[in-house]
Design a protein with these regions (language model features):
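Conserved catalytic core of nucleic-acid polymerases
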Residues: 352-359, 476, 480-481, 485-488, ...
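Metal-dependent catalytic core segments for phosphate chemistry
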Residues: 195-218, 534-578, 582, 687, ...
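A polyanion-binding, active-site-adjacent surface
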Residues: 1-160
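Conserved RNase H-like, two-metal-ion catalytic cores of nucleic-acid enzymes
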Residues: 14, 20-21, 25-32, 36-37, ...
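Conserved "right-hand" nucleotidyltransferase catalytic core of DNA-directed polymerases
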Residues: 155-218, 252, 261, 278, ...
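A generic structural motif
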Residues: 743-749
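C-terminal polymerase-core module
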Residues: 378, 382-385, 389, 396-450, ...
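Acidic beta-strand-to-loop metal/phosphate-binding motif
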Residues: 93-99, 238-249, 525-527
Length: 815
């Protein structure tokens, strides 16, 4: 079964026929076929330009053709032989395997994600693998990727055989050769390789066809000479260096060799991700999209795995340099245009302060760590005991016990013992977190199950212990993370473990862990956090009078929203929140409410809330906080119910009241939709542009709506980090930045300079509160909260006016 022009010189090989192929008498029918037609049209390939054949025309299950490692069975080998014979008769110029099976048949390699987009010469024709349009092709980025690969195939559709680009790579040069190569080089790409905990080599490329790789694995006197030559070049501010994820190289050069990069830096990964945030951003991917260099990244691991020699590893480094140079030549004009240049240069400006954060780290109190572990173990034991009592009560069986870590036991309990209809995932019963959230909620047929909530809490604490409390620290007992400047599409940082496997994601440090992250001796920690940043920004973006009114009156937005949604007096909301705190036990919450007297109103809480709906498992203010965090971003009632643990009917009522009180939000959403449709992207109020790919449906609109405030919030904190790092003020020089976490920055300040602390905090506050202008022309700022203390987990709230006095009191109390 085939499709298209049999005489075409471009042949597409699909893995299997479309599901409706025999019904419709077409190999590319149905939804997948329609998708392929769209991709071909986007690539400029007409029906007459291509011929489609099938690698597996009888639709044999893939498992009967090849195993998971790509080894063909006898049936698979026969199919591969048939395909090759058919292609030899067709005499194509280019063949495009569109899937894992067809890729394996032609290239004897099943690793499609590594090979796609590369060109290979095979038996008289060229082979360019791509992804399967019948499966992954329904994902918008994948459609663009397949289209790009087909465009490449169209360009290569000539009789001439494919020849990989010639590369002149000088490896292990003498010092005088290195000096001559770099002497007249003002603009180079650069890449390092680390092996055995040391920088093994540094590669440079000053054009698209050549590279020079400096081998640093040599006797110390020679190594010192090579380091001096490389350092002089990289530390020269008149030079320009292009890298791929070059913050990694900068961090390693400083951490391992105290080599500072002062040259002007460009980064292909950052450039690509700013322009196309939905695509992958590895050098492998960028090479396949922007160059004609075939896949080579395996070569980097050959020597480390005992394959090949050191020369092959050096040669691999040179290929990285040439690939990076070529990618930059394709990207630079667009990313340095007015459309993207501001956010690109701002992102690159973060490199130096982030390298400092990665190098400095945060002091760890190992004794406190052991105490935190012990407290968590005791908490798990206590919660587990509570769970056993609850399941005995719920099941009316005094001998009932359950292992919260056993999905089988949990399913038997909920769906067997209690006889509840099972929640399913992929058609099978499940007790995952979403299912437990549903079980914890009340329905018209039953009360919410506290046992489900306890199991959630136990699993969360168990994960906390295994994921966060058993992490590795560096030898100097400091907590470090590896920061990623474009870790998210909004411009927010992300982070993870260091190259050595120590540390963890600094963005998700739980409160329990912060207790043992402490100030250095004779220092005090300061955390400055944006106050309800995204909510405030959204208020001005939407120009909603209700939200702006809450901000200008200075009322806590979470309490104000709770009052609007429930009708409960503000004083009662504040009193109840103070009494309940973060308690989630519905019985305990009910008891607290029944006994609570709101002193400012001289009335029982129950009387003041008569007729109002109350969330079972959280305080009224916490419910308002959940509304503020979710409903601005178009969350529906069902998802809101899962997020809050409230009943769906309650969530529908809360959502309706929220959107009635803040009535400009739905209008703003539609304005955002119109903007995305007209420009295929958005520019936020800090002049940062983001492109959006695909159909402008509700899913994309939710992403776009969330992007606008989140990107502005990230921009404020990141720009403050840059400004404060480079500040010439003596007070700022004394203050050290230790972490950048979402909407906050953590500092430490020497206690022997507390007289200057208030001034430092004032400068930092000014940096963190730039004046913004809404689309309606209204100027506004997002306020900053401040906390200080000796442990990140035990900070004291203060004000910028009182921070000096508070610091002195803390210091005196500690003495």
């Amino acid at each position: 079964m085939t499709w298209g022009n049999e005489k075409a010189k471009l042949i597409l090989v699909i893995d299997r026929p479309a599901s409706r192929a025999y019904t419709d008498s077409s190999i590319i029918s149905g939804r997948g076929g329609h998708n392929l037609h769209l991709i071909l049209a986007h690539a400029g390939i007409s029906n007459n330009d291509a011929y489609v054949v099938c690698a597996n025309p009888t639709d044999i299950p893939e498992g009967a053709i090849m195993n998971t490692k790509g080894v063909l069975t006898e049936r698979g080998a026969n199919l591969a032989r048939d395909l090759k014979s058919a292609l030899e008769l067709l005499k194509p110029h280019v063949v495009v395997p569109m899937g894992r099976v067809s890729c394996t048949f032609l290239l004897q390699d099943h690793r499609l994600d590594k090979l796609r987009g590369s060109c290979f010469q095979y038996n008289g024709f060229k082979v360019i693998p791509t992804r399967n349009p019948f499966t992954s092709g329904f994902n918008t980025p994948d459609r663009y990727i397949i289209s790009a690969d087909l465009s490449k195939a169209k360009r290569h559709c000539t009789p001439e055989p494919y020849k990989p680009p010639d590369m002149n790579i000088i490896i292990d040069p003498a010092p005088n050769v290195v000096e001559r190569y770099l002497a007249d080089a003002d603009h180079v790409s650069c890449d390092i390789e680390v092996a055995g905990g040391q920088v093994f080599c540094i590669g440079f490329s000053k054009d698209e066809d050549s590279a020079m790789v400096v081998n640093l694995d040599r006797p110390i006197p020679e190594r010192a000479v090579m380091w001096r030559i490389c350092a002089e070049f990289l530390d020269d501010p008149t030079k320009t260096v292009v890298g791929q994820n070059f913050i990694y190289d900068m961090n390693m050069l400083w951490r391992l060799n105290y080599l500072r990069v002062s040259a002007k830096v460009h980064d292909t990964m950052i450039a690509h991700h700013i322009m196309y945030p939905e695509f992958e951003k590895s050098l492998q991917f960028l090479t396949s999209m922007y160059t004609t260099i075939p896949y080579y990244k395996d070569e980097g691991g050959f020597w480390k795995r005992g394959i090949g020699d050191r020369k092959s590893f050096l040669y691999y480094n040179g290929k990285d340099c040439i690939a990076t140079y070529r990618v930059w030549e394709k990207l630079k004009d667009k990313v340095l245009s007015d459309k993207f240049i501001s956010q690109y240069t701002e992102t690159i400006s973060m490199y130096e302060p982030l390298v400092y954060l990665m190098y400095r780290g945060i002091n760890v109190d190992m004794k406190e760590l052991e105490l935190v572990k012990q407290r968590l173990k005791e908490e798990i034991t206590s919660l587990d005991a509570s769970l056993q009592g609850v399941v005995q009560k719920e099941s009316d069986h005094e001998c009932m016990e359950i292992n919260y870590n056993s999905p089988k036991q949990c399913m038997t309990y909920f769906y067997g013992t209690l006889g509840l209809p099972p929640y399913r995932k992929a058609g099978k019963p499940t007790v995952d977190d979403k299912a437990l959230a549903q079980l914890a909620k009340s329905t018209s047929a039953r009360e919410g199950l506290y046992s489900a909530q306890l199991i959630q809490q136990l699993r969360q604490r168990n994960k906390l212990f295994s994921t966060y409390l058993d992490i590795e620290f560096d030898k100097d007992q400091r907590f470090r993370s590896e920061y990623r400047p474009r870790g998210t599409r909004t411009g927010r940082l992300s982070s993870g473990k260091t190259f050595w496997g120590s540390g963890m994601n600094a963005q998700n440090v739980p409160p329990e862990m912060k207790a043992f992250l402490v100030a250095d001796p004779d220092c005090l920690l300061i955390e400055m956090d944006k106050r309800q940043s995204e909510w405030v920004i959204t208020a001005y973006l939407a120009n909603d009078p209700g939200m702006i009114g809450v901000i200008t009156t200075g009322v806590d937005p979470h309490s104000a929203t709770a009052e609007m949604v429930t009708g409960i007096p503000l004083d009662a909301i504040l009193a109840e929140n103070k009494a309940i705190g973060h308690t989630t036990n519905p019985e305990e919450i009910e008891r607290i409410r029944s006994e609570l007297i709101v002193e400012s109103l001289s009335a029982p809480f129950k009387l003041l809330t008569e007729g109002s709906f109350l969330p079972r498992t959280l305080s009224v203010r916490q419910m308002g906080k959940k509304c503020n965090h979710a409903l601005n971003y178009m969350m529906g009632a069902r998802q809101f119910s899962l997020e809050t643990g409230m009943g769906e009917a309650e969530c529908i009522e809360a959502r309706n009241k929220y959107l009635s009180g803040y009535s400009r939000l739905p209008e703003w959403w539609e304005e955002v939709r119109a903007d995305v449709k007209s420009d295929r992207g958005l520019r936020n109020i800090t002049n940062q542009y983001r492109a959006f790919l695909g159909l402008v449906d509700d899913a994309m609109l939710k992403d776009a709506v969330a992007h606008l405030p989140q990107s502005v919030s990230a921009w404020m904190v990141n720009m403050a980090m840059i400004d404060l790092y480079h500040s010439p003020h003596a007070e700022c020089v004394a203050g050290e930045m230790l972490a950048n976490v979402h909407d906050s920055i953590l500092f430490q300040y020497p206690t022997d300079r507390l007289d200057e602390l208030a001034r430092f905090c004032s400068i930092a506050k000014h940096a963190m509160e730039p004046e913004l202008t809404s689309p309606a022309g209204i100027p506004f700022r997002v306020e900053t909260d401040i906390k200080i203390g000796f442990s990140w987990g035990h900070m004291v709230e203060t004000t910028f006016q009182e921070v000096g006095d508070t610091a002195w009191k803390l210091l005196e109390a500690r003495r």
